[in-house]
């Protein structure tokens, strides 16, 4: 057996292992938050970036092994950015045989007209995109809108809101629009960005850079992202532990009277599920984050195709 053959076999093994991990994470997120139900038509928003390509690929993969039936339609918003390669996404989507729609709206021109040079464009751009995508979902009869935000995006949003907004708030894995007509889901909520990056490279997705956003190097989100990446390198497992904290919120140990009735706490009262004494005693914390090695070295070689948990 040649050295090249051995290398190819290892690459195939690593790709299968990575795909199974992503499938498992997406399947678990879908089940935990009841993201996709029987008969849903899921509109996958495809930007041409690594995240949305991975989202579409994994959902198509899961579609064949899920215990429920659902349909997928891919939608790309062509914002008329100069130099945008309009042929790339249609060619890719036709090659994999998925239903798709390209929506052409000159949001780039609106953003450039309204936002002064040097100012960040993300806020206006995202509002315009959201309105167009909601309208498109209605036109297509889509019951769910799937976005490609992942675990690291959710963590970055948490810190952005703490640092700059004074709120303990992140991206929800599932939300309903203000008018109650659209449900937005984020099936990559449990997926690490570094897994998605590796997967996109291995699958050779035809990535299209966003020149509008990429031209703004001092975005607050980019600064926070670099902070998280530094922590991940220096303290393995920290991001996993922080994400776990987002799923284990204790309102009685925060300071929001809207979430916990501090005013009516009385002597002799016993509160179910609340351990107030921890406020005085130092908690026993593990020397290393509990998720330090999760997923990186796990052996999935014997794992079957991931299936959604049964949803009532």
From Swiss-Prot:
GO molecular function: 4 iron, 4 sulfur cluster binding; ATP binding; magnesium ion binding; sulfurtransferase activity; tRNA binding
GO biological process, one term: tRNA thio-modification
Annotated cofactor note: Binds 1 [4Fe-4S] cluster per subunit. The cluster is chelated by three Cys residues, the fourth Fe has a free coordination site that may bind a sulfur atom transferred from the persulfide of IscS.
Keyword Nucleotide-binding assigned: yes
Function comment: Catalyzes the ATP-dependent 2-thiolation of cytidine in position 32 of tRNA, to form 2-thiocytidine (s(2)C32). The sulfur atoms are provided by the cysteine/cysteine desulfurase (IscS) system.
InterPro entries: Rossmann-like_a/b/a_fold, TilS/TtcA_N, tRNA_Cyd_32_2_STrfase, tRNA_thiolation_TtcA_Ctu1
Binding site for [4Fe-4S] cluster: 122, 125, 213
Further facts: The thiolation reaction likely consists of two steps: a first activation step by ATP to form an adenylated intermediate of the target base of tRNA, and a second nucleophilic substitution step of the sulfur (S) atom supplied by the hydrosulfide attached to the Fe-S cluster.
Name assigned to this protein: tRNA-cytidine(32) 2-sulfurtransferase
Top EC class of this enzyme: transferase
HAMAP family: TtcA
Gene: ttcA
Localization per Swiss-Prot or TrEMBL: Cytoplasm
Protein EC: 2.8.1.-
Recorded metabolic or biological pathway in which this protein acts: tRNA modification
